[in-house]
């Protein structure tokens, strides 16, 4: 082999290929193959492998199966057994049995994947597809959740990043919850204390364990308590909803919800369930708003309850 | 009111006691049962030792010190040169090890006793009173809201499940107290929680390989097996 720096890699490959082809054309392929196979063996000539280059061309075995005589003198039953789908189209006839099974499996699993089974995505492992569907809490919600990208294409760093993002979103949700809670409690306490002191009357704005308190005629300022309460609630709930939709922490909060997880699992069997997931996430968001209202009402109830103790 | 009167309980007593029980329950949940059990065990070791309750722990400490001393002595001598002494020490060490083991078992039993005692105390402090309240005072009105403060529909909601409008029963009261205490705990503890920083995505920077080097890599040395033979 004369190596000169002027010869390019492609040219060198071509020359080697030609030399190899010329060597093969000389014959003795079987003896050469046996020499290669028995390299390192202490006992020589133990291999009796025959090279395909020295085999006699058998002719009409595999390739001519498609050219059947439509009216033969006698029917070869074996031909019916071995020939895959004699009634099928001529394209599929050339496939061997094992190839047929592989193709059949590919078609079956490819057809179950949403989209089509012929493209790159469709020809993936069906188990991986199922897992992908299972681990997509943000799918179908229309929100940009951390899992909206393909988790299986992610590297370990990417996966770590996604985990950190989930933690960060949860923390951000808690921060907003804390801020709103502080504002709510401050406003409600201010409202309660204001009415408690402005009315002055020890009975009109007082709860009691005695039923007679219900028989008293309500004073006007007492009515404004609920007006102010509802105003505070409307403002706070509207702002919370606005921020929740803008910052996307409703979807973060609901992604771990049991109902959403159940829908995720169900959609693996019944893909139509994905459309209900959007509704479920929205309803859970509304439930959070209702929880804000109930929480504020709870504070007022507790204040009145404790006041009933102090009044006795 | 009938049961309250029979037990000579005023509704405000019920308000206060249920509030206290729920507060304790929330605090226990917040601190954690296992942490309380650990504290109780440490308290038992500290106080019980002085009162002569946890003798096994004191004995265990003494025996362990003795064992440590014996082992050190045993290591300092040669088993071949002073075989008799070494065997004597070894026998003593084995005996002490067995004693330490039995004392350890006693301590483990003591600890499980303390844990179960704490569990029973917590049960009597938190869970049982709430069940008693629910069973005995489920029909008792705890307090009445002032007239005109809430509209009718809100009063109706607060009178759940079957009280007259404007009154508050145990169900609503317990729900409200639980809600408020957990919110207050959240307000008090959240500022002390460590903040989570914004994650930064690590992008992979591909190294720029010179074209000549790349072509060299893509076409490795071809080994002609046929040539070799």
Swiss-Prot record, chain A:
Disulfide bonds: none annotated. Keywords: Endoplasmic reticulum, ER-Golgi transport, Golgi apparatus, Membrane, Transmembrane, Transmembrane helix, Transport. GO terms for cellular component: endoplasmic reticulum membrane; GET complex; Golgi membrane. It comes from the Eukaryota. Residues 197-224, 310-312 are lumenal. Its main location: endoplasmic reticulum. One of its GO terms (biological process) is protein insertion into ER membrane. The keyword Ion transport does not apply. Pfam families: GET2. HAMAP family: Get2 (MF_03114). This is Golgi to ER traffic protein 2. The gene is GET2.
Swiss-Prot record, chain B:
Residues 60-117 form a coiled coil. GO terms for molecular function: protein-membrane adaptor activity. One of its GO terms (cellular component) is endoplasmic reticulum membrane. It comes from Scheffersomyces stipitis (strain ATCC 58785 / CBS 6054 / NBRC 10063 / NRRL Y-11545) (Yeast). It comes from the Eukaryota. Keywords: Coiled coil, Endoplasmic reticulum, ER-Golgi transport, Golgi apparatus, Membrane, Transmembrane, Transmembrane helix, Transport. This is Golgi to ER traffic protein 1. Component of the Golgi to ER traffic (GET) complex, which is composed of GET1, GET2 and GET3. Within the complex, GET1 and GET2 form a heterotetramer which is stabilized by phosphatidylinositol binding and which binds to the GET3 homodimer. It is found in: Endoplasmic reticulum membrane; Golgi apparatus membrane. InterPro entries: Get1 (IPR028945), Get1_fungi (IPR027538), Helix_hairpin_bin_sf (IPR029012). The chain crosses the membrane at residues 15-34, 123-143, 168-184. It is a multi-pass membrane protein. Pfam families: CHD5 (PF04420). Residues 35-122, 185-229 are cytoplasmic. Residues 210-219 have a biased composition (Basic and acidic residues). Gene3D superfamilies: Helix hairpin bin (1.10.287.660). Residues 1-14, 144-167 are lumenal. Belongs to the WRB/GET1 family. GO terms for biological process: tail-anchored membrane protein insertion into ER membrane; vesicle-mediated transport. Residues 210-229 are annotated as: Disordered. Required for the post-translational delivery of tail-anchored (TA) proteins to the endoplasmic reticulum. Together with GET2, acts as a membrane receptor for soluble GET3, which recognizes and selectively binds the transmembrane domain of TA proteins in the cytosol. The GET complex cooperates with the HDEL receptor ERD2 to mediate the ATP-dependent retrieval of resident ER proteins that contain a C-terminal H-D-E-L retention signal from the Golgi to the ER.
């Amino acid at each position: 082999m004369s190596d000169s720096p002027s010869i390019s890699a492609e040219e060198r490959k071509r020359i080697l290929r030609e030399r190899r082809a010329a060597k093969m054309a000389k014959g003795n392929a079987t003896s050469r193959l046996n020499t290669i196979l028995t390299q390192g063996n202490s006992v020589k000539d133990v291999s009796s492998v025959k090279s395909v280059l020295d085999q006699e061309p058998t002719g009409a075995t595999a390739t001519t199966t498609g050219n059947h005589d439509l009216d033969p003198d006698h029917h070869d039953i074996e031909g019916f057994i071995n020939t895959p789908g004699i009634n099928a189209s001529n394209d599929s006839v050339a496939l061997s049995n094992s190839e047929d099974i592989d193709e059949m499996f590919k078609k079956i699993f490819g057809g179950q994947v949403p989209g089509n089974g012929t493209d790159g995505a469709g020809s993936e492992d069906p188990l991986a597809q199922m897992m992908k569907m299972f681990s997509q809490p943000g799918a179908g919600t229309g929100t940009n959740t951390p899992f909206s990208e393909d988790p299986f294409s992610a590297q370990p760093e990417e996966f770590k990043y996604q985990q950190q993002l989930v933690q960060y979103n949860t923390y951000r949700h808690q921060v907003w919850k804390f801020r709103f809670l502080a504002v709510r409690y401050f406003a409600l306490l201010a409202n309660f204390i204001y009415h408690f002191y402005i009315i002055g009357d020890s009975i009109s704005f007082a709860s009691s364990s005695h039923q007679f308190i219900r028989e008293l005629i309500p004073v006007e300022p007492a009515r404004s308590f609920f007006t102010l309460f509802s105003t505070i609630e409307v403002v706070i709930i509207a702002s919370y909803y606005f921020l929740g939709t803008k910052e996307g922490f409703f979807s973060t909060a609901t992604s771990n919800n049991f109902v959403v997880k159940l829908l995720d699992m169900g959609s693996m069997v019944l893909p139509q369930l994905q459309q209900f997931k959007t509704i479920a996430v929205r309803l859970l968001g509304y439930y959070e708003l209702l929880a804000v209202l109930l929480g504020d009402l709870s504070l007022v109830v507790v204040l009145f309850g404790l006041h009933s103790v102090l009044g006795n | 009111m009938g049961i309250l009167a029979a037990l000579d309980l005023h509704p405000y007593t019920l308000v206060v006691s249920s509030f206290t029980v729920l507060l304790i329950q929330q605090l226990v949940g917040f601190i954690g049962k296992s942490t309380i059990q650990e504290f109780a065990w440490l308290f038992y070791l500290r106080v019980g030792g002085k009162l002569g309750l946890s003798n096994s722990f004191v004995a265990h400490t003494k025996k362990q010190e003795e064992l440590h001393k014996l082992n050190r002595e045993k290591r300092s001598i040669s088993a071949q040169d002073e075989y008799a002494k070494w065997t004597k020490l070894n026998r003593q060490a084995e005996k002490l090890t067995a004693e330490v083991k039995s004392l350890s078992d006693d301590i483990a039993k003591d600890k499980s006793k303390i844990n179960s005692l704490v569990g029973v105390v917590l049960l009597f402090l938190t869970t049982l009173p709430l069940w008693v309240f629910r069973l005995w005072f489920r029909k008792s009105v705890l307090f009445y809201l002032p007239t005109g403060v809430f509209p009718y529909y809100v009063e109706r909601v607060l009178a759940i499940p079957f009280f007259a409008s404007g009154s508050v029963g145990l169900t609503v009261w317990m729900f409200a107290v639980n809600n408020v205490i957990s919110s207050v705990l959240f307000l008090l503890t959240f500022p002390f929680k460590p903040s989570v920083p914004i994650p930064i995505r690590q992008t992979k920077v591909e190294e720029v390989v010179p074209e000549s080097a790349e072509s060299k890599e893509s076409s490795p040395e071809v080994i002609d097996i046929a040539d070799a033979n």
